[in-house]
């Protein structure tokens, strides 16, 4: 059964910090024959939570940007903070990024109800999404270990969990071989998607103090139904 939240936006798929490059415009006939570089569409999802989709700046503000997306989704009419204000409030910095505890504390101090825990399973993740609850995940940013990280060998300090990244899981599609999950990724233009197997492999991170967060997620249980992606504010 399909369950959807809001109006879906056709979007692109990219992995953290990947940019899609295209050639300059050519003849109209040639353009019409080129297929968009999408790996899927949000309309394919069984469940999709439509949230504001914002871009991070720099290489360390992914957590801050995810928090801003959540706050704008929960209260779009009072979303007058910019990313710098969130960065200061969360204590985000280039060395540590935004630790999980800082995000949870910020939500609690701002009366946003959350459930934060480790060792979540993908069926539990799908269940949260089905209830209309987006989930912040700390993962490894890249799809392949060749991109500079490993999730197994803790003796290799240079690569072990070296590419931590925050994303928001906003939807899923149940397929014969498992789930496909959809994400707001602050390092990407548009939405992203990832297979259940790939997510399980990458769903782990470590903070600067050496604390490992395995299958950690911050489930937003507060109500975000007031957000309307097609709504327009009067420019006063």
Task: Please describe what each predicted stretch is.
Residues 19-37:
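Sec-dependent signal peptide cleavage junction
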Residues 1-10:
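Bacterial N-terminal signal peptides that target proteins for export
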Residues 48-60, 87-97, 109-117, 125, ...:
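Second-shell loop/turn segments in exported
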């Amino acid at each position: 059964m399909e369950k959807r939240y809001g109006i879906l936006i056709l979007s692109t798929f990219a992995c953290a910090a990947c940019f899609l490059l295209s050639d300059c415009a050519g003849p109209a006939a040639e353009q019409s024959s080129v297929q968009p570089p999408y790996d899927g569409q949000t309309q394919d999802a069984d469940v999709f939570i439509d949230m504001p989709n914002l871009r991070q700046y720099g290489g360390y503000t992914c957590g801050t940007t995810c928090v801003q997306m959540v706050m704008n989704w929960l209260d779009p009419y009072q979303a007058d903070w910019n990313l710098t204000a969130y960065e200061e409030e969360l204590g985000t910095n280039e060395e540590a990024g935004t630790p999980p505890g800082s995000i949870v504390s910020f939500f609690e101090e701002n009366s946003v109800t959350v459930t934060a825990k480790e060792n979540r399973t993908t069926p539990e993740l799908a269940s949260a999404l089905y209830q209309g609850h987006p989930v912040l995940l700390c993962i490894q940013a890249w799809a392949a270990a060749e991109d500079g990280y490993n999730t197994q060998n803790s003796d290799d300090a240079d690569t072990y969990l070296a590419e931590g990244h925050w994303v928001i899981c906003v939807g899923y599609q149940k397929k014969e071989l498992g789930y496909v999950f959809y994400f707001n990724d602050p390092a990407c233009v548009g939405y992203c998607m990832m297979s259940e197997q790939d997510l399980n492999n990458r769903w782990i991170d470590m903070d600067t103090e050496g604390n490992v967060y395995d299958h950690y997620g911050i489930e937003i249980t507060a109500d975000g139904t007031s957000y309307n992606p097609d709504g327009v504010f009067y420019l006063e």
